[in-house]
Regions:
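Active-site-proximal cap/loop segments of hydrolase catalytic domains
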Residues: 425-619
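Structured loop/turn residues at beta-strand edges in well-structured enzyme cores
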Residues: 65, 84, 98, 175, ...
Length: 619
């Protein structure tokens, strides 16, 4: 049994009972995801909520206006789907958050014999896509042996359409269920996938699309989004990056022609069809904010859809043309809203119980960096001026970005008297392909260079106290935290790393196969092929240089950042006489249990307070 120093989890963070209740209430307040509905029975919907204290699946009968909790598992359940007729709810059955399992289904109407395997014959694996038709189920899974994509037509039995050692996934099933678009990386670049469209009856190929790399050698990906939702319509909506950012095209399989959509918006785009396939609902992301638009496919007219400034987390168009979407901003807690065809924008679902307390506005900084300005979002505690202790909260991914959205975690750090800085470093999405791909071949050090220039800005602008700067993050952000503590020890007074990559060679050996494929694409090969790149980018390589106290939080069942490589790093800290603590929990890559998230947050703030000495004033 290991003897690592355990992290202290205090009973309270604040002496003021109102402040204590406020921060906890931001986490325990019920939240609801944007609902999905059955295609042919749109009154039947499912959504996820933490109302029970754990994120679980709920059924919503809109006609009867009734809600029912479907799943009840100790470590929660991630998302669900509905059969086309709305009779069955599908959810992914893994073990304690390990993401390895099978799809199961149960009646929408209520519990009967309990959930049963939804697709007899499907192997246990990591999910690689699901698309449900009237008579056809398209399902994918991955294992250490690679990816398998299969169909079951009319209950005739599972039949493999595609199998490969490289990463692949279900893209989209055509409305007439004769074509299946798949995303694949046979070319060895999982970060920039290609598309193949297969005939469902026999698995033969209708067409392939693989964008060749740009002149600078960097890849260009293609992503199948959706077929037009009209029977006989073989138009496939595709995401591309041919002009250096995420844009859209229509690939008509009937004529094998492409039409790139020229949409006059400066940021990255994603979209889906309106129900009659006449238009697209377009999501536009730029500088950490989201706007929504309607793009008419016949005329090319783009119409802005009115939404408040902030971030949209999921959206879809109902049969009547209403747009349902999730929205929040740094100040305003998340809410599921609906934009009616007549222009009314109102709350669709109000979670039960008290609403979480608001927080403060995020401001923007654009800081000159090595390859362009680095975008940072920041906030300081209300009522403060001059330098204050500052948490550099680093996002995961790396293909993700911090946005102007509500965060209970950010809010409690601000309440505790810390400024918060988010850095959308090179590697982040939302700033164009070149920015996202700048870390290829040099991961870790590239992102840290951007974090360093933002750190310098925060200190020089009298936001951050240079003696009280905290490096904090989860997943890839946790990885960058550990790497930063070793490569930039002069910058950081303390570090908190949640579910991090800590020993890259051991992580590669133990992680799920889709992430190995991602790493090969990111690093330029496997550890056998480019060992020095992995060695240089691995936090354990630089552990001797760590000066700051380190808190690590890790899941025992994490398939993405497995526990063995975390233990290797802790052993290296211990051998070097470094100050550290560990919080272990019985789940995977993060927790769906609200009480566990509260423990993590309390442990981080308590650890940082002890490391920095006298606490800043509470707000």
């Amino acid at each position: 049994m290991r003897q690592d120093p355990p992290a202290e989890v205090p009973d309270t963070l604040f002496a003021d009972p109102a402040a204590e209740a406020r921060w906890r209430g931001r986490f325990t307040a019920a939240r609801i995801s944007v609902p999905n509905w059955a295609r042919d029975a749109p009154s039947h919907s499912v959504y996820s909520s933490n109302a029970s204290g754990t994120w679980e699946v709920y059924a919503w009968d809109r006609d009867a206006d009734t809600h029912r909790q479907v799943t009840d598992r100790p470590q929660g359940t991630r998302g669900a789907a509905l059969s086309v007729d709305g009779a069955a709810i599908w959810w992914f059955d893994d073990t304690d958050g390990d993401e390895f399992g099978v799809w199961v289904s149960e009646p929408f109407a209520g519990p009967g014999a309990g959930p049963a395997p939804a697709v007899p014959g499907a192997d246990r694996g990591y999910p690689a896509g699901l698309d449900l038709g009237t008579t056809t189920t398209a399902i994918g899974w991955s294992t250490d042996d690679g990816s398998t994509l299969a169909v079951d037509v009319g209950g005739s039995g599972l039949r493999t359409l595609y199998q490969h050692t490289e990463d692949a996934g279900i893209g989209a099933l055509s409305r007439d269920e004769t074509l299946l678009a798949v995303s694949h990386s046979e070319h060895g670049d999982a970060r920039h996938p290609a598309i193949r469209v297969l005939r469902v009856p026999d698995g033969s190929s209708v067409g392939d699309r693989h964008d060749t790399p740009r002149a600078d050698g960097q890849g260009r990906g293609l992503t199948p989004i959706a077929f037009a939702p009209v029977a006989g319509d073989q138009r496939l909506l595709v995401g591309h990056e041919r002009r250096g950012r995420d844009e859209l095209l229509i690939w008509d399989l009937a004529s094998d022609t492409e039409t790139e959509l020229v949409i006059d918006l400066p940021g990255d785009l994603t979209a889906d069809f309106y129900p009659d396939a006449s238009a697209l609902l377009v999501g536009h992301t730029r500088a950490g904010r989201t706007t929504m638009h309607r793009y008419d496919l016949a005329s090319g007219v783009l119409t802005d859809l009115p939404t408040a400034p902030g971030s949209v987390g999921g959206s879809d168009v109902r049969p009547d043309g209403s747009v349902e979407y999730g929205w929040s901003s740094a100040t305003s807690p998340p809410l599921v809203r609906v934009l009616r065809p007549d222009g009314r924008d109102e709350a669709l679902l109000t979670p039960p119980g008290d609403r979480p307390a608001p927080s403060v506005v995020l401001d923007d900084a654009w800081v000159p960096g090595e390859e362009g300005d680095v975008h940072a979002l920041w906030a300081r505690p209300e009522g403060t001026s001059g330098p204050v202790p500052t948490v550099f909260m680093i996002h995961g991914g790396p293909q993700a970005a911090d946005e102007d959205r509500y965060s209970a975690v950010r809010a409690v750090w601000l309440d505790a008297g810390f400024a918060v800085v988010h850095v959308n470093y090179r590697g982040s999405s939302g700033y164009g392909s070149a920015w996202r791909d700048a870390i290829e071949g040099r991961p870790g050090t590239t992102e840290l260079a951007d974090i360093a220039v933002v750190h310098e800005w925060a200190v020089s602008s009298d936001l951050a106290d240079p003696a009280a700067c905290v490096l904090e993050g989860w997943s890839w952000g946790g990885y960058l935290t550990l790497l930063g503590l070793g490569l930039q020890p002069e910058l950081w007074a303390v570090g908190c790393a949640g579910v991090p990559v800590a020993d890259y060679l051991a992580a590669y050996a133990d992680e799920m196969e889709p992430l190995r494929a991602f790493d090969r694409s990111l690093f330029g090969g496997s550890p056998t092929e480019v060992p020095e790149v992995y060695r240089r980018a691995s936090p354990i390589t630089h552990v001797a240089a760590v000066r700051a106290p380190v808190l690590v939080l890790a899941g025992e069942n994490d398939p993405r950042c497995p526990i063995r490589q975390v233990d290797n790093y802790l052993d290296a800290l211990a051998a070097g006489g470094k100050e550290y603590a560990i919080l272990r929990y019985d789940a995977g890559h993060g927790s769906l249990v609200v009480a566990e998230t509260l423990r993590h947050t309390a442990a981080e703030i308590a650890f940082v307070r002890r490391a920095l000495g006298p606490a800043p004033p509470e707000r």
